[in-house]
Amino acid sequence: MRTLIGLLVAVALAVPGQADAAQWGLSGEVGVARFGGTSRDSSGATLGPYRPTTFGLRVDRELGAVRVGIGVLYARTGLAGEQDQTAVVFYDRASLVEAAPEISITVARFGAGVVTRVAGGPSLDIWDVDGASRTRIGARGAVALEWPLSGRCTGSLRATGVLSGSVMNRDETPAGVGRRATRRGGVAIELRYRL
């Protein structure tokens, strides 16, 4: 992880380009997330995090069509047991702090400054479930639609997907319950300020 962060910083500082093309940016986002996987028993019942509101901050460096950055995300979530369209939710049982370096690339430009970007990178997820901390490494991908709001501000709608190890530890699942990779999908509205 340290090697990847070092590589991203080196690329951000070393990629040649026009002097005025390299821009730093600071973003804030608010979103919602939906989880899948985590643990499942033989009857099909699942247990996992349940639909939190997410808050994120990201600092990045834009080099033409490429943007390199690192983001931090926070979510406070409940744990839910779900089966046959029914959920039993235990609120405020877990929290997630995620650090995610990423590289994004512009894939399409539309009139009036609207841009579509794709992004990807690793994620480091630190979960606190009922006071017990656990760390998971995952992969993260995103698609964003950005539009200008003013000279220095852009807004965006961002869809993100993350795949990581199960939130549950081996000793937390009873017999007959299997741990599964945790999948997270999310949608967020973001405001970016060009520094």
Residue ranges and their predicted role:
Residues A45, L79-A80, G141-L195:
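Predominantly the C-terminal beta-signal and adjacent terminal strand-loop region
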Residues G56-I137, L149, G185-R194:
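Gram-negative (and chloroplast) outer-membrane scaffold detector with strong preference
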